[in-house]
Amino acid sequence: MRKAHELAIGERAVIIDVDNSHPSSHRILEIGFTPGQEIELLNYSLFKDPLAFAIRGTIIAIRKEEANCIQI
């Protein structure tokens, strides 16, 4: 399995799971990064932190550390 921060710009994937042991996992789930949702990496800043994802018809930027707990 890959992590969301490993996507290339323009690449899409479906979320398989969110690592519940990660401190930010509750926040990630609350903002819509839930299993079964399709995400697309739109852009990122220097060093891939933060990353901008398209999900559920909106754009959400999260830190690389948070994207690391999203399994695709």
What spans do the regions from the language model cover?
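Compact, glycine-rich, soluble single-domain proteins
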Residues: 1-72
